[in-house]
Amino acid sequence: MYQHTHHLDNQSILDVRDLQVRYNGNLALENITFHLHSGERVAVVGPNGAGKSTLFKVVAGVLPSSSGEVSIYGSGPRSHICIAYIPQRSQVDWNFPVSVADVVMMGRIAKLGLLGWPHKRDWELVQRALETVHLADLSKRQISQLSGGQQQRMFIARALAQKSELMLMDEPLSGLDAPSQADILSLLDTLKSQGVTVMVATHDLEQAAQYFDRIMLLNHRLIGFGSPDEVLQPAMLIQAYGGRLRKTEDGKNLAIDDSCCGEGETHEHAH
């Protein structure tokens, strides 16, 4: 079971040092080192198969590392209840018979313990979280009946009810229409105002540059980590994307062809 761990004000919320992860003898992540501070909003970008999901799972304590160190406020991920991990929607069984409110209440279970029973205060926090993400009127609906955007907002509500301090979101904008993406990005502003540190895996470099404080460019190793202007440079992008990177016809933009983004879809970044 998770334990409550005291947090010091001057600590980094997340420290990753010399992280390596192997799958069946193959190196998925190599020599990854970075630090995050409270309230930061970080986009994690890189080609399909670069290790973004693997990184999130290791930080969340879902997967073990082969070597290196991951610490949340100075101790391992499994020592904390402040981490919220939101997987890709394709990894969720949406036919599981559970309501929206029940899923959001799961954010309180870590606080209560497996044998704990929700109190009035817990349901009030669930209701408040649902109101924040504009799903209060859908609280009794089965999760299979939600749209893609509503599904992502439900998971954000669960993290809010959990009172998470570090949120890991694996491609939350993928497959959503523009209004739904705008809703999620607006909620990221709400999280930032509450001091929540957010890491978001995304394939959209324009959104990464516009909405995030820092960008992590990943392809099994850490190629760049800094402000959008520092990281979204042609030399670094070529290291990460290789042959997927090309100039657009006007010669002013860099376009990335990435099969995971959809048939024939490209993403551009101006330089």
Please identify what each model-predicted range represents.
Residues 60:
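Helix-to-loop junction immediately C-terminal to a conserved catalytic motif
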